[in-house]
Every structure is written in structure tokens, then in C-alpha cells.
């Protein structure tokens, strides 16, 4: 059995050794939930990796979006090159959920483009979990969404080994039952037979196939072949073919499921007709009958997940199977950026239910489709294994779950300390922001200003522009591609000041920023809560000269808590640097060079009209914007962005 072994040129430093020790000892004592409070740049990922290495248990790391998950995945792969590090996120390149808008009588069919590589990685993840112990899965919150039964997925595998006797026709039938397609084209999830040679392209491989050579009904040899070069890369003693779908179902079980679907359909049609909903009755009858016929013929259909209650043998309202059900009971779970991820997990169920209820009411789906859903928060809580919440600003939920006990990691390898916080009167704040900005710009640095309203951001931007400051603003009305272009301009110095409303959601990581100005810091609310203030203050922590000015006529409870926490961290960091002779250095980070092949994008009031590159990251940002509209039931806006994605995908760099 393989063991976790970190490969790194660096050893644990600063607070890392103590954090690793405390977390590991807590797990050993049976502590179910712990908090790692780690400031940005302190090496939280290395700490997580070290705990996994110490405990030698399978691990799941949950991030709040695909981009962050991808970063963590790459880091973990570097730390564990000889172990199974897997990536499990939604496999849609874009996704417009099925929806119905009653007021305009518009039905929007589910429209999705499945990313084949991500689908392959999902299969690789579930296969690794079921076959080995040295596995780390980095996932987005999609890991709490419904997935096929792990028991069926595991039971329906086809083990093949040298010397094994198996009828060729029987093997082909089994592969078809696992949703593999027969054909001459060699692509993932297919197989072909030429004479006594069966070539299988496994669901979890990107470019390797298995070549099974038979002598009569006996397997003579098994080779792993590079599909691009046609060269054998390994001779294998045995392989296990996993299903090409997580919703694969044995034929007898499938027929039982179809019978139950038929029963529900008849009840549904009778109910619609009884309530004089003739159109809805005909609609559900036609759509469901078509799906039933497809499943009878091929074992699957479009939207098969909506019948998961029956396919997985679940009772009405019973929690769906998810990735969590595939994991061993002794697995470790890390919730990264828990102050964002936990609220996201909490909100998933309700948004999904509202959308599906609309479809059911108007005859587009059977009521059982409600069971194709994410876990409720309570269900997720009941499935938690040994868990570590990771954040620079843990939320109330996390600290309550651990009775206020946290493991701190405050020291950065670069020696950078948290910025100095200054409180100034709110009266006259505009004039002072201008003066402070000009002074900071003259030293070659950038400025971030956070305002409370879009109008204030626009007015301040206009005022600064009139006096010759290169400025732009960001808020929710600024489109994704424009937003990315503005941030790039700030990094390169085309813009010196960036004004925003909620700069937290921009994910700004700007080493050139030496000043953050928080206007109306004493106006209590989400944007001026303790967590938001600490996160905003952290925007200046990438620069050794970082300062934060909070404009307020009174010091609120949130302000005091945020400033006290920042000062506490700074004192710890300065003391450590002094004791170890460390001189802080600003982070050096290259500006992305992906703005070369350009297409025209409409400019904003905050910047001149110019062009912006369309990269993979651009498309991902738009997809997130589209999903946000869909979650808010703004399906027409989501549809508009989906169309924009389709156009821009043709211009990706």
C-alpha cells in the first residue's frame, strides 16, 4: 500500500510546525472539528498537506469555486507527485439550468457543455477513492450534489486479468451495460473489437487505452497503450473497468425503476387533469414517455439524474448519494475559505428546490425530480467526518462548533506583516482620500478605495478623473470581461486608483497596492462587518509599506474588533521577525500576459473603451456570473450571458 509522502524543497516554518502538531494531535484525540486560522500567504496549503501526511488518511478538500479548487489541486499534486490527487468539480463548461418563467411562458431547456477532461477527472476521483487509500480529492461545493450510488458503481465494475476466461460476446454486453459505446473511433468511454483484440478506453483515462489480447475465451495479455502514439507503455497483470456513468444501473434494477416511474407518471397525469391542467398533463406525459423509451433502449436518457430516486432505490425525501458517500469513514475533510464555503453549502438546497418546484408545477418534471438535489445543510452536517475549517476570518458557525478554540498560523514566509490601520474622521473623507492617493501614487504604488454605494463610487471616480488621477471603479454593473481588464490596468499602472463597492468578491491580489481606503467604515452592515473589514484590510498585506485608512466619525464594534485583530497579528509577526532577523519583502507577482489577442469590449464609465483578451479564465468568470443569475432565478439574464459565452468561446486565447 502506498503512503502519503510530501515532496518539497521547503520544510515547515514559522507557525506551521505548531499548527501541524496541534491539528494532528486533535485528530488523534478524536476531536471532530477544528479551525485553522491562517493569514493570507502563511502557507495554509502546506499545513493541510502535512496533516494529511501525518495522519495517512484519505482526504477531501472543499473550495468555494472551481478556480480556487484548481489552484489547490495543482499545489497538492506538487506536494504529492506519487499519490492520487484528484479533482472533482462540476463538469459543465457552461450550464444553464432547466427552468420555466411563468409570467412570460418561457421554458428554458437545460443547456450545458460538458468538459470531457473534467468528466474524466471526476471518474478518476471516484475510482481512486474506491481502489486506494492514498487519495486526496480537491472539490468544489458540487461534491454535495446528487451522484449515483457508490454501491452500484463499485459492483458493476468488470475485473479482467491474464488467464481469466470470459466469452467475448459476454464482455461486449457487459461493457455496453457500463455505458461504453462500441465503435471504431477511439475516444474515452468507448471500446472496439478487431479479431481477438479488445481495445477499451477507460472512463478515467485521458490518453491511455487498454489492449486486451485473447486466445479463444482466455485473456492472453493486457497492455496499457498511449492512444496518441500507439505505443505500449506498460504490461499489466489485471485491470478493473469502471462504469462510464455514475448513474449506471443493472438491467433488472433499471426495469424496476422504470415501472415505478410509470406509476408516478400516471398519478401525476390524473392529478393535472383533475385540476383542469390539460397542457401540463400532456407535457409531462410526452416528456416522461420519451425518457422511459430512451432508458429502455440505451440505459440512459438526457437528464437521467432527475430519476435518481428510482435508479438508486431511494425513498421520497431521502438524502441523495453524493461524493461524500464514496469516501471512507476515517477520511479527513478540509473546508477552505470556510467563511465563504459554509454559507454556500447552507444555501444550495433552497435555490435548487425553488427552481425545480416551478418545473414540476408546470408539467416539465415529475415530483420525484425534487430528490435530484444537493444535500440540505443538516444532511451535510450529519455526513461530516473529521473536519478542519480553514480561513483567515473563520465565521461564527466554525468558531461555535469548536467552542472558540482555533489553531493560529500568522507568520508569513516572506516576513510581511499585516498593514497599519489608521482611523480618520468621515467628514472631509473625499478630500483626504484624494491627498493620500496622490501621495501614494507619487511613490509608485496603487490605491484601493471601497465605497458603500455604486453612486458614491461613480461620483468619486469622476471627481478624481477631473483632477488628473488615473482612476476606475468596479461594482456589480461592470461586466466580467471589463472587470478583468480594469484589474489588469491597475497592475500595469494604466490605472492608479481603483474604487469598488464590494472589493472582497473581486479576489484582488495586488502587490503594488500600498493603500486601502475604507469610506464610511462606521456604517454597520455586511460590507462593514468584522469579517469584511479584516478581509478588506488584508488587501494591503501584500506590500511591505501597506496602510489602511478607515474613515469614521465613531469606532463601531466591528471596526474595533477588526483593527484589534489586525494589530494583534501585526504584533505577533513583528515580534517573530525581530527574534529571527527577518526583513519583510513585498511579494513580486508577474502581470498576466494574456491580453494580446483582443476583441472589442464595451468600456465602462470608469475607463476608456478598449479591448480585452478572452481566455479560459474569462469564460470561467462569465460562467460564475451566469450561475449567480440562475441561482437568483434570473433566468433571462443567465440566458443572455450564456449566449455571450457561446460567442466569446470562439475567440479564446
Swiss-Prot record:
Primary localization class, coarse: cytoplasm
Entry keyword set: ATP-binding, Cytoplasm, DNA damage, DNA excision, DNA repair, Excision nuclease, Helicase, Hydrolase, Nucleotide-binding, SOS response
SMART domains, A to Z: DEXDc, HELICc
Origin: domain of life: Bacteria
Limits of the UVR domain: 616-651
Domain Helicase C-terminal: 429-591
Domain Helicase ATP-binding residues, every copy: 25-182
GO molecular function, one term: helicase activity
Function statement: The UvrABC repair system catalyzes the recognition and processing of DNA lesions. A damage recognition complex composed of 2 UvrA and 2 UvrB subunits scans DNA for abnormalities. Upon binding of the UvrA(2)B(2) complex to a putative damaged site, the DNA wraps around one UvrB monomer. DNA wrap is dependent on ATP binding by UvrB and probably causes local melting of the DNA helix, facilitating insertion of UvrB beta-hairpin between the DNA strands. Then UvrB probes one DNA strand for the presence of a lesion.
PANTHER family the UniProt entry points to: UVRABC SYSTEM PROTEIN B
Domain-level remarks: The beta-hairpin motif is involved in DNA binding.
Subunit and interaction comment: Forms a heterotetramer with UvrA during the search for lesions. Interacts with UvrC in an incision complex.
Name used for this protein in its record: UvrABC system protein B
Gene name per UniProt: uvrB
Amino acid at each position: 500500500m502506498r503512503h502519503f509522502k510530501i515532496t518539497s524543497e521547503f520544510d515547515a516554518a514559522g507557525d506551521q510546525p505548531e499548527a501541524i502538531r496541534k491539528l494532528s494531535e486533535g485528530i488523534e484525540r478524536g476531536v471532530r472539528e477544528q479551525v485553522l486560522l491562517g493569514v493570507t500567504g502563511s502557507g495554509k496549503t502546506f499545513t493541510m498537506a502535512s496533516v494529511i501526511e501525518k495522519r495517512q488518511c484519505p482526504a477531501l478538500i472543499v473550495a468555494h469555486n472551481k478556480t480556487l479548487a484548481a489552484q489547490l489541486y495543482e499545489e497538492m499534486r506538487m506536494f504529492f507527485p506519487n499519490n492520487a490527487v484528484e479533482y472533482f468539480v462540476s463538469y459543465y463548461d457552461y450550464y444553464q439550468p432547466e427552468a420555466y418563467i411563468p409570467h412570460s411562458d418561457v421554458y428554458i431547456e437545460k443547456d450545458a457543455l460538458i468538459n470531457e477532461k473534467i468528466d474524466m477527472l471526476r471518474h478518476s476521483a471516484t475510482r481512486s477513492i474506491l481502489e486506494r487509500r492514498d487519495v486526496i480529492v480537491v472539490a468544489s461545493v458540487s461534491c454535495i450534489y446528487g451522484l449515483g450510488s457508490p454501491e452500484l458503481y463499485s459492483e458493476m465494475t468488470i475485473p479482467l486479468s491474464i488467464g481469466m476466461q470470459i466469452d467475448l460476446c459476454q464482455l461486449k454486453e457487459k461493457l455496453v451495460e457500463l455505458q461504453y459505446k462500441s465503435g471504431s473511433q477511439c475516444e474515452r468511454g468507448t471500446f472496439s473489437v478487431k479479431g481477438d483484440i479488445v481495445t477499451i478506453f477507460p472512463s478515467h483515462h485521458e490518453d491511455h487505452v487498454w489492449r486486451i489480447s485473447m486466445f479463444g475465451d482466455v485473456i492472453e495479455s493486457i497492455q496499457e497503450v498511449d492512444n496518441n502514439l500507439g505505443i505500449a507503455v506498460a504490461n499489466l497483470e489485471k485491470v478493473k473497468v469502471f462504469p462510464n456513468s455514475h448513474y449506471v444501473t443493472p438491467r433488472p434494477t433499471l426495469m424496476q425503476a422504470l415501472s415505478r416511474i410509470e406509476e408516478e407518471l400516471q398519478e401525476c397525469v390524473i392529478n393535472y387533469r383533475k385540476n383542469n391542467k390539460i397542457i401540463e398533463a400532456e407535457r409531462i406525459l410526452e416528456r416522461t414517455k420519451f425518457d422511459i423509451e430512451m432508458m429502455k433502449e440505451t440505459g440512459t436518457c438526457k437528464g437521467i439524474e432527475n430519476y435518481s430516486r428510482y435508479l438508486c432505490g431511494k425513498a421520497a425525501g431521502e438524502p441523495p448519494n453524493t461524493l461524500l458517500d464514496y469516501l471512507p469513514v476515517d477520511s479527513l475533510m478540509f473546508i477552505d475559505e470556510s467563511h465563504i464555503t459554509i454559507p454556500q453549502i447552507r444555501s444550495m438546497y433552497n435555490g435548487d428546490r425553488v427552481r425545480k418546484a416551478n418545473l414540476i408545477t408546470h408539467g416539465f418534471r415529475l415530483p420525484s425530480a425534487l430528490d435530484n438535489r444537493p444535500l440540505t445543510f443538516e444532511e451535510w452536517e450529519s455526513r461530516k467526518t473529521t473536519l478542519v475549517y480553514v480561513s483567515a476570518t473563520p465565521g461564527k458557525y466554525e468558531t461555535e462548533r469548536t467552542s472558540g478554540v482555533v489553531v493560529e498560523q500568522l507568520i508569513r514566509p516572506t516576513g510581511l506583516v499585516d498593514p497599519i490601520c489608521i482611523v480618520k474622521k468621515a467628514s472631509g473623507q473625499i478630500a483626504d482620500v484624494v491627498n493620500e492617493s496622490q501621495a501614494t501614487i507619487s511613490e509608485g504604488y496603487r490605491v484601493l478605495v471601497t465605497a458603500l454605494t455604486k453612486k458614491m463610487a461613480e461620483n468619486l471616480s469622476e471627481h478624481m478623473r477631473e483632477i488628473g488621477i488615473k482612476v476606475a471603479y468596479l461594482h456589480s454593473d461592470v461586466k466580467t470581461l471589463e472587470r478583468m481588464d480594469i484589474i489588469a490596468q491597475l497592475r500595469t499602472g494604466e490605472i492608479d486608483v481603483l474604487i469598488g463597492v464590494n472589493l472582497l468578491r473581486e479576489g484582488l491580489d495586488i502587490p503594488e497596492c500600498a493603500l486601502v481606503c475604507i469610506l464610511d467604515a462606521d456604517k454597520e452592515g455586511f460590507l462593514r462587518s468584522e469579517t469584511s473589514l479584516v478581509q478588506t484590510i488584508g488587501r494591503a498585506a501584500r506590500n511591505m509599506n501597506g496602510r489602511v485608512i478607515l474613515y469614521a466619525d465613531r469606532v463601531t464594534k466591528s471596526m474595533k474588533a477588526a483593527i484589534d485583530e489586525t494589530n494583534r497579528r501585526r504584533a505577533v509577526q513583528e515580534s517573530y521577525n525581530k527574534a529571527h532577523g527577518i526583513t519583510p519583502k513585498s511579494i513580486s507577482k508577474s502581470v498576466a500576459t494574456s491580453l494580446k489577442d483582443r476583441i472589442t469590449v464595451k468600456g465602462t464609465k470608469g475607463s476608456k473603451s478598449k479591448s480585452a483578451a478572452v481566455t479560459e479564465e474569462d469564460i470561467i468568470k462569465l460562467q460564475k456570473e451566469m450561475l449567480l443569475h440562475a441561482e437568483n432565478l434570473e433566468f433571462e439574464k443567465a440566458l443572455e450571458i450564456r449566449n455571450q459565452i457561446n460567442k466569446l468561446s470562439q475567440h479564446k486565447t
